[in-house]
Amino acid sequence: MTMRIFNFSPGPATLPEPVLRQAQAEMLEWNAVGASVMEISHRSAEFIALAKGIESDLRCLLGVPDDYAVLFLSGGATTQQALLPLNFAAPGQTADYVVTGHWSKTALKQASPYVNINVVADGERDGFQDIPNRAGWRLSKDAAYVHMTANETIHGVEFRQTPDVGDVPLFADFSSSIAADLIDVSKYDLIYAGAQKNLGPVGICVVIVRRTLLERTGQPRADIFTYASHAERDSMLNTPPTFNWYLLGLTVKWMLAEGGVQEFARRNQAKAQLVYQTIDQSGGFYRNGVAAAVRSRMNIPFFLPNVEQDARFAAEAKAAGLLSLKGHKAVGGIRASLYNAMPLAGVQALVAFMHDFQQRYG
């Protein structure tokens, strides 16, 4: 039997082995219906019951209040970034964007054809090594919403607290940190998250939105681009990615069985601490310049003394069963992604490899 490696990919990311094994066992026949879950109608009583159960489990996992709709939509976060202004900003209105890394810049770019953009804070001036202090943010007077990216996978910075933006709706991309730590959903008006990091496979996106927001007119658009239409049809306005939805449900059940978000917050802090300690105690052989208060627990970028060492590290790590550690092309270096499904044993193996590599080449 082939041994599974430790997969540090930033997304699509490692999935819990129990989830994969259950999906494997149910591949040919699910729930005694005589067919795979990916073969049955999304409008069948069996699948509708499955979908309702998954929503209930996700609400339990994240503590989603009743006055929020939970949507399961095709695609990923980038699609939502374009849909936000179409749904919630009137023509000619301004939206505020907090820029803390590559993905918040992407969100701004996707929204810019449909809304006037005000950059309230820009971490690029400091190389995205810190999150600009809230006291210096330049919020608009009548913004349609404020947008933030909770965790930046490439630059490795993370909001540890929810920023106070007053009465303006706060929208957040939680793709890479949803269910990784406890959050108060009620402090946000809309949360969106591509599933492929902590919630399941690529191809499905969760949107959690305050129901009163769905009453906004926004801009002219088709029903398929309208959150209210998806909410009215229980995320089945069009044929949904049923197998992805099913896998997301298995992943959520696994997280609940393991102790919920509180337990994963504990695990994630412990895993990240192991890697950061190894970096900080390496005498400069490994470098991470992110301000300590905003260091990401999900994505840890670091650099060796030169690009040749970076390449050697990634290649030897792969040979040692540590996959996908090469940094993003935008910044280079090395990146370890430690999502919920990454076991402590994988992080311990990485840290042991880091020590060994430094002994041999440091």
UniProtKB/Swiss-Prot annotation:
N6-(pyridoxal phosphate)lysine: residues bearing it: K197
Cofactor requirement: pyridoxal 5'-phosphate
Compartments (UniProt record): Cytoplasm
Enzyme class name: transferase
Alphabetical list of InterPro entries matching this protein: Aminotrans_V_dom, Pser_aminoTfrase, PyrdxlP-dep_Trfase, PyrdxlP-dep_Trfase_major, PyrdxlP-dep_Trfase_small
Entry's Gene Ontology cellular component terms: cytoplasm
Biological process per Gene Ontology, one example term: pyridoxine biosynthetic process
E.C. number: 2.6.1.52
Binding residue positions for L-glutamate: R43
Catalytic activity: O-phospho-L-serine + 2-oxoglutarate = 3-phosphooxypyruvate + L-glutamate; 4-(phosphooxy)-L-threonine + 2-oxoglutarate = (R)-3-hydroxy-2-oxo-4-phosphooxybutanoate + L-glutamate
Cofactor binding notes: Binds 1 pyridoxal phosphate per subunit.
Xref: SUPFAM superfamilies: PLP-dependent transferases
Keywords: Amino-acid biosynthesis, Aminotransferase, Cytoplasm, Pyridoxal phosphate, Pyridoxine biosynthesis, Serine biosynthesis, Transferase
Residue numbers binding pyridoxal 5'-phosphate: A77, T78, W103, T153, D173, Q196, N238, T239
Pathway the protein takes part in: Amino-acid biosynthesis; L-serine biosynthesis; L-serine from 3-phospho-D-glycerate: step 2/3; Cofactor biosynthesis; pyridoxine 5'-phosphate biosynthesis; pyridoxine 5'-phosphate from D-erythrose 4-phosphate: step 3/5
Keyword Thylakoid carried by entry: no
GO molecular function: O-phospho-L-serine:2-oxoglutarate aminotransferase activity; pyridoxal phosphate binding
Known partners and oligomeric status: Homodimer.
Task of the protein: Catalyzes the reversible conversion of 3-phosphohydroxypyruvate to phosphoserine and of 3-hydroxy-2-oxo-4-phosphonooxybutanoate to phosphohydroxythreonine.
NCBIfam families: PRK05355.1, serC_1
Membership in a protein family: Belongs to the class-V pyridoxal-phosphate-dependent aminotransferase family. SerC subfamily.
Protein name: Phosphoserine aminotransferase
Organism lineage: Bacteria, Pseudomonadati, Pseudomonadota, Gammaproteobacteria, Lysobacterales
